[in-house]
């Protein structure tokens, strides 16, 4: 059985930065460090940080006075940010992915102008909640759509003063269909100058398409609440391949590999490489050959952590 690895796969720059912020805060200030929402959507990462002293909460009211608080990579609404700043916290660090912040700024600009804004995204996802929460102009409006059907049912105040933006972790193909519907329904609508779906999401989706051409079965390492990981599994299935979203090697069912000549492995942007290595080990124990990595896009983007954490770590060293 051949084992093919998607390239790129796993951690993106935003996830690397978010995890590093929590790790550095723990190293400098010690436990507990409070984090609003799971810093990234991966069970292994969250459990590891929890064991090291991170406390994951959903409400700012759960954070005691004098504590250190970190916002997750998914971002928060202006209301949550204001609530946190009103508290007597020792330090407040923002681990919001800079590419999510870009979308936040687009929404905030629309709000200031009074332009109605339409967000393409998944209802209930923390990134969507944070992005929707950047709009505060009662004279305008902020709307959420997930499908072309939502677009055709949407009613706005002024069809001549509209813009749209997207969640960063969506399916590129699905989003394109929604954008086409928006442009057909509202010809005057204005989109972002640069796509909001992030480079890592796009690259990993391209890689899984290439993987699905060669593999009989695709394993996606990622947690069930990871939007980008779910999209990878969906893409593989649309390509006609059996695809399974797994948290770890222990989730692999031997029956999935019965009669399989080639298995493809990829990982969502919040899944650490250690989990991929464990999956490879399991596949090789089941008769797999040495893993081969397919060609793909090189990624060299790095997002810096907040200056306070860089300075303090340097001083500690």
Swiss-Prot record:
This is 4-hydroxy-3-methylbut-2-enyl diphosphate reductase. Keywords: 4Fe-4S, Iron, Iron-sulfur, Isoprene biosynthesis, Metal-binding, Oxidoreductase. Pfam families: LYTB. [4Fe-4S] cluster binds at residues 12, 97, 198. The active site is at 127 (proton donor). It catalyses: isopentenyl diphosphate + 2 oxidized [2Fe-2S]-[ferredoxin] + H2O = (2E)-4-hydroxy-3-methylbut-2-enyl diphosphate + 2 reduced [2Fe-2S]-[ferredoxin] + 2 H(+); dimethylallyl diphosphate + 2 oxidized [2Fe-2S]-[ferredoxin] + H2O = (2E)-4-hydroxy-3-methylbut-2-enyl diphosphate + 2 reduced [2Fe-2S]-[ferredoxin] + 2 H(+). (2E)-4-hydroxy-3-methylbut-2-enyl diphosphate binds at residues 41, 74, 125, 168, 226-228, 270. Homodimer. Its EC number is 1.17.7.4. Belongs to the IspH family. Catalyzes the conversion of 1-hydroxy-2-methyl-2-(E)-butenyl 4-diphosphate (HMBPP) into a mixture of isopentenyl diphosphate (IPP) and dimethylallyl diphosphate (DMAPP). Acts in the terminal step of the DOXP/MEP pathway for isoprenoid precursor biosynthesis. One of its GO terms (molecular function) is 4-hydroxy-3-methylbut-2-enyl diphosphate reductase activity.
